[in-house]
């Protein structure tokens, strides 16, 4: 813990040969913060792919990161508060890489009584004792004693939103593009996501709707539809019927909702695409405060699912988790409390689902419930509640008790927790992407990537259904 006070050493208190040191270990966040603060986005510091091909073969610190640490010693300790920089020279001998531990040593070299200036040798060495930076600083030293309470620095959280988004998009790399039919995409957001997915090689979009209206919307938003197939349909009902026909005939692997009310969109969808599974929605969500992405289901399709419906929701979510690379997902069945309460149906359903998993009726995952949201995602909360299970505090899948709870949970995370997310409807003949008027283009494209992953999985030889 840092000292409670910050105190200087005056000109008269420092003798030639006196020194002070500071030791820091370079973390990736240090490089990111320095880039944000300075605007220095030299790819040698911020682009791992570029850095790998550079002479140093990995990301290195900005040179002035070490210079800033020299300034830290001079300004906070030796001499400390009241010090004014006059000049600084630096010579860089070798790069500082992530994980390097750097020791900064500042040594008094000369003093000038007439103007209270001092000259310091500045040396930065790494954990192997190798010199990385050397230089000389001249300062106007303080002549009056200063002792102040140390300022408590605010916590800084780095939003790696774009990195998390691109990690998700990268999952489509190497996969063959899928034909996706967009039903009545007459608003700019639908068209933009279709074109973005096309340009990324994710999809071959087919736009079904009133052609004049589609092209007018595209022209108004400067969207190029030249490489998109457009199928004329006079209204949204005809567009949806055409989309469903394409899915049933195998001409489309994905259906995407356009400007069609969700309840009007889902009813014919369920009737036309239902298999031996119940349709359910899964949201793949990545928040910076959780160590890995997780899945929430169901927030869009099943309003008040009965126990038998939840069995299918869990099975769909588990299959989806497998597609996303989670070999044995930890599934938390959410409720308002962690104990079985006869008057709370969500707790009874949770207990029944877990027993079904124990008996092999639900396989491919580890289930626990009922669990509150806090005890599902927080190891500290789970320990405090004395919940000892492989799921508590580290869930990969959250099964909401009903649509309202799932929807509110997901939207809270999306709007208040800097979440990157995408969703897909599972259990049908083809994956389906639902549209929300508040979805960003990145969220829409993320959903299309998820649909591609599900469609690609469907291309593989099917395993026996559980």
Regions found by a protein language model. Give the residues of each.
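Anion-binding alpha/beta catalytic cores of soluble intermediary-metabolism enzymes, centered on
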Residues: 158-206, 211-391, 396-466
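HotDog/MaoC-like acyl-thioester-processing domains
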Residues: 2-16, 97-159
